[in-house]
Amino acid sequence: MYVEKINQPTDVKNLNSEQLHILADEMRQALLQKLSKHGGHFGPNLGMVEATIALHYVFNSPTDKIVYDVSHQSYPHKMLTGRKDAFLYEDKYDDVSGYSNPDESDHDFFTIGHTSTSVSLACGLAKGRDLKGDSENIIAVIGDGSLSGGEALEGLDFASELNSNLIIVVNDNDMSIAENHGGLYKNLKQLRDTDGKSECNLFKSMGLDYVFVKDGNDIDSLITAFEQVKDSTYPVVVHICTQKGKGYKIAEENKENWHYCGPFNLETGKSDMSQDGGEDYSSMTADILLKKMKEDKTVVGITSATPTVFGFTEDKRKEAGSQFVDVGIAEETAVALASGIAKSGGKPVYGVYSTFIQRTYDQLSQDLCINNSPATILVYWASVYGMNDVTHLGIYDIPMMSNIPNLVYLAPTTKEEYLAMLDWSIEQNDHPVAIRVPISVVSDGKKVTKDFSKLNEYEVTQNGSKIAIVALGSFYSVGAKTAEIIENKTDVKPTLINPIYITGTDDKLLEQLKANHDVVITVEDGILDGGFGEKIARFYGNSDVKVLNYGLKKEFLDRYNPEEIVKANRLTPEQIAEDVCGIIG
C-alpha cells in the first residue's frame, strides 16, 4: 500500500499520476475503516482526499503553510504529514485529535476548531512573511459553509490589500453542516453552473484573482490549478467543487446526516450506538416550538447552521417553513436578528451550542441586552459532560453571559422546570432570556408553579441547618447527593437550594441563612472564575459564614475523560461531603 509508505509530504511528490489515484483510494478506505469504528467528521474529510494530495504534491509543507478552516477536514492532511498510523491502526486511533494541532506536527500551524478563521489567520502569516522578506506560499483552505461567517468575509476583504502571495482554496461542496443559506451561496452556485465564468463573481469583486476547478475530486485537475497559482505574487482564490462524503454512497445521498458520525456498520450505515428511545431536550424543544408556531405566527426558530442542536431536522424545518431561519455560520447575525425580531413584536428562539455562543459576545451585550429585547436563547451542551475537544468546550458560558446586565440566565434542574422556563420566556416581554439546557433529561413529574418573572428568587427544596448547599442546574443532583451523604455521616441535615437564576443572587434568602448556617456550598457545572459561586461568596465576604465554591478550574482541557476531570476538581458528592465534614467536625 502506498499510504503505508507516506511518512512526509515529500513522499507524495515521488508518485506518478496513477499512483496518486491509488493513494487516494487507499486513504479513503482507511478513513472509512477508522470512522466506522471510531467516529468523527465524515463528509468533509472524504470530500477533501484528492485536494489534500494535490496540495502536498505541489506545495512544500511545512515551509509553505496550509491553514485549514475549522480543521475538521484535516484528516487526509494528517495522513500525509507523518500521522498515518493514527488512521491505519486501531490501537493508535486516539493518537491524534480531530483538528489541526501544532503539538502533533510542524505541518499544523494553529489549533483550530471554530469556523471562518482561516483566511484571517493566513493573512497574518502572509503579512508576517512579508515583514521578514520571506517568500513561502501561504494557503488557506475554507469550505463547508464557513464563508458565511463574518470573519471569513473580513479576511477576504483584507486579503486583496496584501498585494503579495496568498492562496485561498474554497472547497465548495454546496453544503454547510446542513444546506447552505444566503446570497453568497447563490453566487457560488452561479459560478459552478458557468464553470467559473459568470460575470457576477464575489471574489473578483473583492479584488482577488480567481481560478475555477470544476472537478475538485480529480487529482490531475487540482495539481494543474495549484501549480498555476504556486508562487503567485497576488492573492488568488482557487474555487474547487468537491463532493461531500465522496466514496460512500450512503453519505453522498444523505450529506447532512453524515457531516459527523459515531461508530457505524460500514455495510449498512446503521449506527453502532445504542438507541434507547429516551427523551432528549433537542427533539422535545423542536416539537414544542412547532406546536407554538402553529398557534402563533410570530414564534420563530433561529439557528446559525446547526439546526439539529434544538431538534430541527430537515423534516421539521420544512414543517416550520418561514418560521424557521438559518442565518448560516453567523452567530453574531443570529443574536442581532433575534433582537430585531423581538423589537418588532416577534417571539424569536435561538438554539446554539455553548461553545459557539462565545462567538457573539458583543451582540449579546450591545444588540440584545442594552436594548432589553425579549428574545430567548437556548444554550446546549454547556457542561463538563459536553464536547471535550479543546476548541469546543462548553464550560465558559456562565462567566461570559451571567455578568451581562438585563440578561436573565436560567438553569433548569428537571424537564418540567425547563418546559416551564421555555414557555415563560417565549411569552414574556420584559427581558432577554437564556436557558442553560441540561444534557440529560431528568423528570420528577412535579408541576412547576413558579413565577419566573419574580427574578432571583431561589427555591429551598430542603430545609436544614448549619450547612446550605446551593446547587446550580444540572449539578443540582450533585448537591442533593452531597446533602444525603453529609446527613448520613453527621446527623446534620443540610439546607438544599435550587437557585434557578444564574444571573443574580437571592439576597433575602442568603441573609436569612446567616441565622443558623455556618457553611454555604455552591456547586456548578462550569469554571469557577467569574462563575455563579463567586457571586454567593461575594455576598458573604464580610460575614462569618464560610463559603466553599465547587466547579472547574480555568484551563483548556482537551480530549478528557469527564469523570476524571470531575474528580480532579473534587466535584463528586463524596469528595464535597468529605471536605464539609472535615470543617464541621
PLM regions with names:
Residues A86-V96, E161-M175, C369-W381:
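A glycine-rich helix N-cap at a beta->alpha junction
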Residues Q29-S36, S97-T111, G133-I139, T313-V325, ...:
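Glycine/charged-rich beta-loop-alpha catalytic/anionic-binding loops adjacent to active sites
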Residues K65, Y248-Q358, Q363-S373, S465, ...:
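Non-catalytic terminal/interface segments that mediate subunit docking, oligomerization
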Residues H41-L162, V299, S304, T313-E314:
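Cofactor-binding active-site loop characterized by glycine-rich and histidine/acidic residues
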Residues D108-F264, K270-G278, S282-D287, L407-H517:
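Glycine-rich ThDP/TPP pyrophosphate-binding loop and its adjacent helix/strand module
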Residues P263, S271-Q275, G386-N388, V408, ...:
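Peripheral docking tails and interdomain loops at the edges
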Residues M1-M79, K204, D215-N217:
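N-terminal amphipathic, basic-rich helices that act as targeting or association modules
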Residues G40-M48, Y68-H72, S100-S120, I142-S146, ...:
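Active-site nucleophile and cofactor-binding loops and adjacent substrate-binding regions
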